[in-house]
Amino acid sequence: MEWDERPGSNDVPTPVMVDVGDHALCAQVRGKGPTVVLDCGGSGQGIGGWGEDLERTLAERATVLTYDRAGVGRSGGSQARTVAEMADDLHRLLHALHLELPAVFVGWSYGGLVTQLYATRHPSDVAGLIFVDPTASGTPPGSALVRDLSFLLAPRLLRLRAIFGGTNAQPLRELAVTLTGMQNAMREVAQARQESGLPPVPIRVITAGRRPRMPKTHLEHLNADHHALADQSPHGQMMVAERASHQIPFEQPEIISQAVDEVLSLPPNSQEDLNR
């Protein structure tokens, strides 16, 4: 597949549909250099979901891939039932596009779960991992009954909002599907980390410095998981986006650029050694 490299053509690249088997994924590639994969949070509408400033900055030094997950945005198929299916979809997409591997994977929020599963299933594809305020894996603290009711009611409220959502109707319905399977996704990733662990590549975990009010036990659970992610590698580090809430790509995008630069600056032979 060829990309238009004429001056100015890479400013707003045209998304393409890429066959990954029984469906096609909508993907956007911009820039030149080593591959950086941005895996978005929410329902998984990744094209345009990271903010133009961040994508443009990263594309000055890397080949940047964004994409919509199956059944989301402009991608075909149905929304995946498991995180492993999402990770394998991304694996097929990267190889279909013939992008340079190993790549640096950047997962924001729910995308952090996808990139973790990707790393456990396809470690040779991974040169580095950057988690942007990732969703915590495992089982959150508190009452199981309250937790189950919350994950039951939230998708229903989103679907109700979608009835009057106008242009936001589709993303709201897609997010409802994601939340319906959220508890299973968090358990799935926790189990994969326990069984396989992440590859010993450089890891940066960027945590939000401005959090909404939440129970102390939930905050402790979130912080503990972020530190545990960084500790998965001898080359892991925590970073705090002091000025940002969960919306780090929009409120403090420079800290993501810094993390990518740190990982990309490692000599190629060091990354190869880490992947062995």
Task: List where the protein language model places each region.
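N-terminal cap/lid segment of alpha/beta-hydrolase-fold proteins
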Residues: 4-24
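Conserved HGGG/HGGXW glycine-rich cap/lid loop of the alpha/beta-hydrolase fold
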Residues: 18-76, 260
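Active-site loop/oxyanion-hole signature of alpha/beta-hydrolase fold enzymes
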Residues: 66-106
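Active-site loop/turn elements of alpha/beta-hydrolase fold enzymes
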Residues: 69-72, 77, 134, 208-210, ...
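Flexible "cap/lid" loop of the alpha/beta hydrolase fold
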Residues: 129-162
